[in-house]
Each structure stands twice: as C-alpha cells, then as structure tokens.
Amino acid sequence: MEIPKFLFITVIAIGLSGSLTWANPLANPEAEATAEAGPEAEAVAEAIGEAEPALPLLPLISLLVSLIPAIKSG
C-alpha cells in the first residue's frame, strides 16, 4: 500500500499543531485572577499548568508506528 507523501506530511503537521496548543501561553491563568479565586482554583490552575501534553501525542505516535512498514516497503 502506497501512502502519498502529502498525506503523510499533513498527518504529522496536524498532530504537531494539536500538541502545540497545549503549550499556548494564553492558556495559563493570570496570577491576579488566581489569587482572587481562592486556594481551590489555585490548585486546579497549577495542576492544569503542570499537566503533560501526552494525550495529543499518543494518536500521532501510534499512527507513525503503524505506518513504518508501509514507509519502508514503499
């Protein structure tokens, strides 16, 4: 099975752009808003800020692993 190069590059670009949205600086709450919200909101904000972006990378990695035999044969 031959996979077009543009499709392969598109899948990689979409996967990487999805994982980069987790690192968006606008997603982090401001310190002033967190201080006004209380200790529970501060703990949640810290947990969200420290969360690793593993979820968007898992489909990309699994796709790449499944495409390796097709890439090597083609």
Swiss-Prot record:
It comes from the Eukaryota. GO terms for cellular component: extracellular region. GO terms for molecular function: sodium channel regulator activity; toxin activity. Residues 24-53 form a propeptide. The modification Serine amide is found at S73. The keyword Signal applies. Residues 1-23 form the signal peptide. Keywords: Amidation, Ion channel impairing toxin, Neurotoxin, Secreted, Signal, Toxin, Voltage-gated sodium channel impairing toxin. Expressed by the venom gland. It is found in: Secreted. Vertebrate-selective toxin that causes pain by targeting voltage-gated sodium channels. Belongs to the formicidae venom clade 1 family. This is Myrmicitoxin(1)-Pr3a. It comes from Pogonomyrmex rugosus. The lineage of its organism: Eukaryota, Metazoa, Ecdysozoa, Arthropoda, Hexapoda.
